[in-house]
């Protein structure tokens, strides 16, 4: 990833303004019907594609869409339904564990704080941020591989790790655009600013991007 300078506030505002104009209400691509099914889907999505996760969870969630039903389904049957997803054995254990803890500690409800969410098996800061944002409308920034890449390439937020990038994004994204920023950055990274062969000629922010100017 080339070394670039941080963008100015005006340039950052313009970038998110353009994202907003072409996609005013961006949505995540994981399929879910409740805070619980969202939590499970996000846990399953680690090192997996949303398409692959959705294919597995359509059947899984028909069988079990609550912590109680997931425990009744059991680890082996969970494995049967998510076998196409990477790290499926470990993820099945995490789903059983987090479901049990939700029942025991949270009255079967998905908690609404970082600390409580991260006490669940398989839930780190990124997963907690996604759940807080998508399930409860809390303005957060979850830095996945797409957000990290786009932030550094464009100079929106430069950091050596996801924590540094998250910290910079929180400081630098205009409040007007903060709630949807996570999804805009993910979608831009997934479909335009790809890891290999980014589509700079099709990019709506290319003339603002220092990485494009370096090429």
Where are these regions (language model features)?
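Catalytic cores of DNA base-excision repair glycosylases
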Residues: 2-215
